[in-house]
Amino acid sequence: MAIERTFSIIKPDAVAKNHIGAIYNRFESAGLKIIASKMVHLTKEQAEGFYAEHSARPFFGALVSFMTSGPVMVQVLEGENAVLANREIMGATNPAEAARGTLRGDYAASIDENAVHGSDALESAAREIAYFFSADEVCPRTR
């Protein structure tokens, strides 16, 4: 088993519904450590930059509007197989297909407002972490 880091966003819908603590509890209960965290209200430019890979997709404008509609929590998670572990905790992208007990199954209302984002691979995790956090903002936990 490998200790990995992954990136997570609690999206505006879940922040507005006060699900931050419950979601953090799920991360920690699954053995993931939160080693960096902050609340930000994304600008249009930040959202467009973060989701640049989707810029040609028809949903891009709506995604940017949603992600700038309110504050988000961004965090770095660390643990064994963190990328896969977080994706399992999140559940299917479409909440209608997400199992109960997953974040999207329990907290998401629609595919457009699906509560959380998580990196899909180690490479994207490294890129996404660097987008929001400087090296000195990430605090490895040794205890």
UniProtKB/Swiss-Prot annotation:
It is found in: Cytoplasm. Signal peptide: none annotated. ATP binds at residues 11, 59, 87, 93, 104, 114. GO terms for cellular component: cytoplasm. Pfam families: NDK (PF00334). It catalyses: a 2'-deoxyribonucleoside 5'-diphosphate + ATP = a 2'-deoxyribonucleoside 5'-triphosphate + ADP; a ribonucleoside 5'-diphosphate + ATP = a ribonucleoside 5'-triphosphate + ADP. GO terms for biological process: CTP biosynthetic process; GTP biosynthetic process; UTP biosynthetic process. Its EC number is 2.7.4.6. InterPro entries: NDK-like_dom (IPR034907), NDK-like_dom_sf (IPR036850), Nucleoside_diP_kinase (IPR001564), Nucleoside_diP_kinase_AS (IPR023005). CDD domains: NDPk_I. Its cofactor is Mg(2+). Major role in the synthesis of nucleoside triphosphates other than ATP. The ATP gamma phosphate is transferred to the NDP beta phosphate via a ping-pong mechanism, using a phosphorylated active-site intermediate. PANTHER family: NUCLEOSIDE DIPHOSPHATE KINASE, NUCLEOSIDE DIPHOSPHATE KINASE DDB_G0292928-RELATED. Homotetramer. This is Nucleoside diphosphate kinase.
